C-alpha cells in the first residue's frame, strides 16, 4: 500500500517522517487518544478503515486492537489546516487506552469544567 501522492504532498512530517493523529469517537465526540502515523500507516488506514499507527518505541506499525480486540473502525479521516495532524473519527470497540480505559484522557482531570 502506498499513500496517494496528492495526499502525501500535503502532509508535514517531523524529522522522523511522522505526523500526529488525533482520534475521536464518532457517537460521543470524545477524544480517545493521540498517536503517531507515517505515510504507510495512513495509506493502510485509508484503504482498510482499520486504524493503523506507528509505534515510536517499537519502530513499527501497529493496528489498533490487533492483539487486544479493542478495535477502531475508521469512519472518516481529515487533514488539519497546517497539514501536520490528521483527525480520525472512529467507532471504538472496547477501551481506546492501553490501560483499558475508554479514553486516554479519562485518568487525570487537571481543571474542572466551569459550571
Curated annotation (Swiss-Prot):
Residues reported to bind Mg(2+): 80, 82, 84
Official protein name in the record: Phosphoribosyl-AMP cyclohydrolase
Subcellular location: Cytoplasm
Family in the record: Belongs to the PRA-CH family.
GO BP field: L-histidine biosynthetic process
Main location: cytoplasm
GO CC, any one term: cytoplasm
Organism: Mycolicibacterium gilvum (strain PYR-GCK) (Mycobacterium gilvum (strain PYR-GCK))
Gene label: hisI
GO molecular function: magnesium ion binding; phosphoribosyl-AMP cyclohydrolase activity; zinc ion binding
Enzyme Commission number(s): 3.5.4.19
Catalyzed chemical reaction(s): 1-(5-phospho-beta-D-ribosyl)-5'-AMP + H2O = 1-(5-phospho-beta-D-ribosyl)-5-[(5-phospho-beta-D-ribosylamino)methylideneamino]imidazole-4-carboxamide
Cofactor: Mg(2+); Zn(2+)
Binding site for Zn(2+): 81, 97, 104
Keywords: Amino-acid biosynthesis, Cytoplasm, Histidine biosynthesis, Hydrolase, Magnesium, Metal-binding, Zinc
EC top class, as a word: hydrolase
Subunit and partners: Homodimer.
Pathway: Amino-acid biosynthesis; L-histidine biosynthesis; L-histidine from 5-phospho-alpha-D-ribose 1-diphosphate: step 3/9
UniProt function note: Catalyzes the hydrolysis of the adenine ring of phosphoribosyl-AMP.
Textual note on the cofactor: Binds 1 Mg(2+) ion per subunit. Binds 1 zinc ion per subunit.
Superkingdom: Bacteria
Amino acid at each position: 500500500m502506498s499513500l496517494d501522492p496528492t495526499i502525501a504532498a500535503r502532509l508535514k512530517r517531523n524529522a522522523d517522517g511522522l505526523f500526529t493523529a488525533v482520534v475521536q469517537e464518532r457517537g460521543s465526540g470524545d477524544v480517545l487518544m493521540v498517536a503517531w502515523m507515517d505515510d504507510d500507516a495512513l495509506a493502510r488506514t485509508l484503504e482498510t478503515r482499520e486504524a493503523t499507527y506507528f509505534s515510536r518505541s517499537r519502530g513499527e506499525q501497529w493496528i489498533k486492537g490487533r492483539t487486544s480486540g479493542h478495535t477502531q473502525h475508521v469512519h472518516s479521516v481529515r487533514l488539519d489546516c497546517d497539514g501536520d495532524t490528521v483527525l480520525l473519527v472512529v467507532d471504538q470497540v472496547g477501551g481506546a487506552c492501553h490501560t483499558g480505559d475508554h479514553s486516554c484522557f479519562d485518568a487525570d482531570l487537571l481543571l474542572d469544567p466551569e459550571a
